[in-house]
Amino acid sequence: MLLMLVFMAPVSCAASDKFYADNVPPTGNPIEENTEYFEKFVDLGSATLEEKVDMAARLIPTPAQLEWQRWELTAFIHFTVNTWTGQEWGDGTENPDVFNPGELDTDQWVRTLKDAGFKLVMLTAKHHDGFCLWPTKTTSHSVASSSWKDGKGDVVQMLRESCDKYGMKLGLYVSPWDRNASCYGTPEYDDMFVAQITELLTWYGDVAEMWFDGANGSSIPGTPTHTFDWPRYMKAVKDLQPHVVTAIMGDDIRWVGNEAGRGREQEWSSVALQPAPLKNPATVVSGLEAKSADLGSRDVLSRAKALYWYPAEVDVSIRNGWFYHADQQPKSLETLKQIYFASVGSNAVLLLNIPPDTRGLLPDADVQRLGEFGTWIRESFTDNRVIGGDGAWQAASGKSREFDVQPGQLFNVVMLQEDIARGQRVERFRVEITSDGSTWETIAQGITIGHKRLVKLDTPRTARNLRVTIEQTRRTANLSNVGLYYAK
């Protein structure tokens, strides 16, 4: 299909200081001529709706955001004094000696996750209780005050070494809410928290993702609260390691809005939701929040004053709780399959929590379930029934492309992918099959695609040909992959 050439009338707007113009895209492939691409942010100014739609199509991720999206599977490790006290939120009064993982083996954590296909492991270096899993200089509420390894242990360092050993990326969760710090609620606490960020980003090598929770104590009556200095925290992170993506209360990755393991029917990465650290009243859309069902449709764009490349992360635990509890069991394989379709298959990255037990090991049942999950993914998404489906192609609104399908091969999953290095553009799609070359049957339709869209069919099918129609798109749609798979 011929590439459409689109020539834009100038639109008054302010964008990020990094953009791509004159046919030089982030992928190095030919794209629309004379096109300006906005990286991560664009101010819509006084643009009309059609101009906003066009600008949304030219909003693209940073290289770090793009890499993050391609990981697809990431793992959370909730591990601290709560593992022994049985609490989900510790209160900061714990005796450090309660932390005593006699068989701690971070190699087991990382090896298990690597074998299951995960690309990053995220450790709760500090949860709300304030207990630090590294020998911080900022507080005595840490592993250095425990009897574990005679106070010389360092969980973060152990995990760093395991990640290096197995080729896994390291992420760190650091709670700004600290129920142990006596200075919490005062300006001195901001200094303390920045010092903790600095230690983590200077002592432990490259960190790929930093996860900042938004809880501050306001939900518990009588608990001190704090107004977090998010711009200062984010500056500290980016000054120390510019490539780090910051999640949830950061400005690179947003919380999907639930802990049920599912994305939206229309999951946009270019959204009008302002990232938490920015705090710019001029670009806030009234009523729009992380839990809103729609963050980027044309209806939202009509009210938007700015747009952000702010992709979704789906965080969910393999058990009912985030921390280990002996009376809980891992979710079934069928449930994990559903979560995969609703997260990775809905233009999001899955952050699956697997909590170590009091030994310091991932529980045997969880290890078995992760192995089953990884095997299912590999077996399901290895053999694409579409012939030539992995080639890049473009389509304007209403245009289609047909593909041959491996004869006689069953499939029950449709996969579509956009080249999001050039933005997210598809607003409505339809997928049809034919067995005789003339009678077409619709088997899937939807709104957004993004990095990856998976549609599970009710019944396995065979076909001679497949047709993908981009019914509506913002500028020219850039498809990178079309697939039909059989998932048991």
Identify what each model region corresponds to.
Residues S16-I433, T442-D458, T469-S480, Y485-Y486:
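Mature catalytic domains of secreted/periplasmic carbohydrate-active enzymes
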